[in-house]
């Protein structure tokens, strides 16, 4: 779809959506996004130029269907997939991608760390994906050095970053906000550094006693990104890994640096979103969202969860969806899903499904709470179908039609019950919606009550 859009841009020094927007040009991607979001193209252009909205769309990802992440657009959901040294198969990861897109993932991150050829699995995922693909390049940088922090050089990091751009990755998590002077602030935490990328860079800085190379070479990374229109997802290396560590000095020190880097990327006209926690008590979620908006000049916020309790292994998709709904309500632009396997193991296909549905609920609830135009239309349509006992319509409008039908059919599987005015909860004689009271009856009652009031 995008081939004809991209061809005229070849050879230009800066082909980012932000660069076009700042120059008053509405791209085909902006027009496409405007139709999907039911917003004026001029507003999309203005928000991209301002940095409040991004369209992750690498020019080498030609089969991409552009989408928007930002406060002006609907709240989005990301799904993480990826092979590990202990569980790996390219075909399985491609199937996870397809399942994620089926159940509504707006973007997908390939977090593969080993066990397969990382280039091959990434290329297979990008080839099959119509949604933006994100990666964390430091994983492959470490793998390319055979797991040796000592052998990793600054150029190794940049080489992998450009390789990901060349392959069509739409956004990359760049852990540039973690500075060597932040590391002592981790003392006193219960869980220390829980970001894999952050942990790699912390070890690199400690070994070499040098500043974070992704920070010192940040302008070089911007030069790479502007050639491909790759978007920054600025990683939060010091995100809290438990409630005890939330909103501490380490997290907030890095956030301040992320704000500085956001504005530096904008001077290059490179798009940015900023990643956030993590594990946060409910009473601190609003503070975290507002603080990010303040420090990062309203760049789109992209949070993992956050989990609102630490005692829910096996059910972390529920704990985190509670926090995600609140974060979305307060203005977070994209929610990174958490699966039931979080903290326990690599998610399988069913875990991907469970996590995504939980997060589609959270994002949708946030859109309703933020009074986005049309956000509640589907809810109202389903409610009408429920009141009219239109079971097939209810299934169709559900976030997970297959699961809704499965649960209904466990007790009433015959086709005749698709027209029944009851379910197995109340049975045929006790459903309150079965005894409908007409509007005429209610009007008549209201008239009688009015007369009674008048006569008193």
From Swiss-Prot:
It comes from the Bacteria. One of its GO terms (molecular function) is 4 iron, 4 sulfur cluster binding. GO terms for biological process: thiamine biosynthetic process; thiamine diphosphate biosynthetic process. [4Fe-4S] cluster binds at residues 423, 426, 431. Pathway: Cofactor biosynthesis; thiamine diphosphate biosynthesis. Transmembrane segments: none annotated. Its EC number is 4.1.99.17. It catalyses: 5-amino-1-(5-phospho-beta-D-ribosyl)imidazole + S-adenosyl-L-methionine = 4-amino-2-methyl-5-(phosphooxymethyl)pyrimidine + CO + 5'-deoxyadenosine + formate + L-methionine + 3 H(+). It holds the Pfam family ThiC_Rad_SAM. Its cofactor is [4Fe-4S] cluster. Substrate binds at residues 80, 109, 139, 175, 195-197, 236-239, 275, 302. GO terms for cellular component: cytosol. Zn(2+) binds at residues 279, 343. Keywords: 4Fe-4S, Iron, Iron-sulfur, Lyase, Metal-binding, S-adenosyl-L-methionine, Thiamine biosynthesis, Zinc. Binds 1 [4Fe-4S] cluster per subunit. The cluster is coordinated with 3 cysteines and an exchangeable S-adenosyl-L-methionine. Belongs to the ThiC family. Catalyzes the synthesis of the hydroxymethylpyrimidine phosphate (HMP-P) moiety of thiamine from aminoimidazole ribotide (AIR) in a radical S-adenosyl-L-methionine (SAM)-dependent reaction. PANTHER family: PHOSPHOMETHYLPYRIMIDINE SYNTHASE, CHLOROPLASTIC, THIAMINE BIOSYNTHESIS PROTEIN THIC. This is Phosphomethylpyrimidine synthase. It comes from Prochlorococcus marinus subsp. pastoris (strain CCMP1986 / NIES-2087 / MED4). The lineage of its organism: Bacteria, Bacillati, Cyanobacteriota, Cyanophyceae, Synechococcales. The gene is thiC.
């Amino acid at each position: 779809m995008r081939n004809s859009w991209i061809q005229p841009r070849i050879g230009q020094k800066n082909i980012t959506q932000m660069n076009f927007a700042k120059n008053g040009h509405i791209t085909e991607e902006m027009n496409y996004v405007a139709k999907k979001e039911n917003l004026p193209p001029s507003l999309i252009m203005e928000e991209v130029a301002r940095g409040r909205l991004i369209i992750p769309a690498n020019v080498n990802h030609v089969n991409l269907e552009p989408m928007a992440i930002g406060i002006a657009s609907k709240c989005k959901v990301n799904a993480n997939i990826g092979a590990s040294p202990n569980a790996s198969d390219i075909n399985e990861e491609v199937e996870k991608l397809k399942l994620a897109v089926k159940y509504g993932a707006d973007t997908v991150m390939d977090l593969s760390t080993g066990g397969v050829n990382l280039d091959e699995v990434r290329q297979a995922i990008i080839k099959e994906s119509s949604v933006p693909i994100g990666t964390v390049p430091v994983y492959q940088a470490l793998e390319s050095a055979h797991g040796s922090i000592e052998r990793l050089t600054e150029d190794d990091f940049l080489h992998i970053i450009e390789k990901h751009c060349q392959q069509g990755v739409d956004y990359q998590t760049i852990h540039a906000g973690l500075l060597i002077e932040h590391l002592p602030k981790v003392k006193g935490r219960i869980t220390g550094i829980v970001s894999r990328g952050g942990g790699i860079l912390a070890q690199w800085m400690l070994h070499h006693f040098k500043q974070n190379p992704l920070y010192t070479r940040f302008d070089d990374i911007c030069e790479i990104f502007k050639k491909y229109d790759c978007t920054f997802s600025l990683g939060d290396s010091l995100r809290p890994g438990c409630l005890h560590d939330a909103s501490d000095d380490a997290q907030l020190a890095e956030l301040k640096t992320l704000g500085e880097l956001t504005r530096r990327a904008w001077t290059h006209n490179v798009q940015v979103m900023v990643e956030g926690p993590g594990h946060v008590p409910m009473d601190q979620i609003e503070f975290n969202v507002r603080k990010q908006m303040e420090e990062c000049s309203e760049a789109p916020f992209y949070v993992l969860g956050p989990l609102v309790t630490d005692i829910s292994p096996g059910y972390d998709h529920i704990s985190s969806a509670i926090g995600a709904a609140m974060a979305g309500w307060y203005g977070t632009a994209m929610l990174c899903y958490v699966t039931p396997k979080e903290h326990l193991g690599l998610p399988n296909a069913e875990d991907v499904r469970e996590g995504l549905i939980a997060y589609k609920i959270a994002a949708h609830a946030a859109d309703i709470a933020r009074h986005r135009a049309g956000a509640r239309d589907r809810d109202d349509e389903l409610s009408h179908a429920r009141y009219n006992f239109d079971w097939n319509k209810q299934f169709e409008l559900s976030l997970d039609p297959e699961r809704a039908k499965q649960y209904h059919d466990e007790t009433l599987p015959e086709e005749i019950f698709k027209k029944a005015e009851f379910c197995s909860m109340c049975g045929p004689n006790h459903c309150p919606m079965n005894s409908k009271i007409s509007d005429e009856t209610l009007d008549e009652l209201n008239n009688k009550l009015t007369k009674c009031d008048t006569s008193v």
